[in-house]
């Protein structure tokens, strides 16, 4: 029988879009839908955005974040931290061809950056099972 964490990881693999919330300069949550470009398990998610975006400004000021995803009435809500990644090697590793529409200079585009979300706490509602738990480092 699959654990709730395994179910959540499988669900995340099927979700193309997640909601990522930063904390604004005024202290309010600012959730935005974003394309999930990669993930590990249920709790580490990679996303991309422009280095000049408001969310990057927020995360550089305060890395605390929330991330949620859902499918067919099931959902996972995570809290954790976001790291803004700008090193060329990692940017190249995660580059996807459709990014060229937003970053015309490819993975070397100075505005292209990655966001790495790592959860510290999770709330699961999957198959009518409701669980809150700390996320252990893997």
Task: List PLM regions with ranges.
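Charged, gly/pro-rich active-site loop segments
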Residues: 77-138
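Hydrophobic/aromatic beta-strand elements that line small-molecule binding cavities or substrate pockets
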Residues: 34-37, 82-83
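Low-complexity intrinsically disordered segments
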Residues: 4-5
């Amino acid at each position: 029988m699959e654990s709730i964490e395994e179910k959540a990881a499988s669900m995340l693999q099927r979700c193309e879009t997640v909601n990522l919330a930063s904390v604004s300069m005024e202290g309010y949550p600012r959730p935005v839908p974003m394309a999930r470009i990669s993930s590990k398990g249920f709790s580490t998610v990679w996303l991309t955005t422009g280095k000049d975006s408001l969310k990057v400004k927020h995360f550089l000021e305060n890395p605390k974040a929330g991330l949620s995803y859902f499918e067919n009435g099931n959902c996972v809500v995570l809290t954790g931290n976001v790291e803004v990644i700008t090193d060329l090697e990692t940017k190249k590793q995660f580059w996807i061809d459709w990014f060229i529409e937003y970053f015309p200079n490819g993975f070397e585009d100075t505005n292209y950056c990655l966001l790495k979300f790592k959860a510290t706490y999770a709330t699961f509602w999957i198959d009518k099972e409701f669980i809150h738990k700390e996320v252990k480092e893997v």
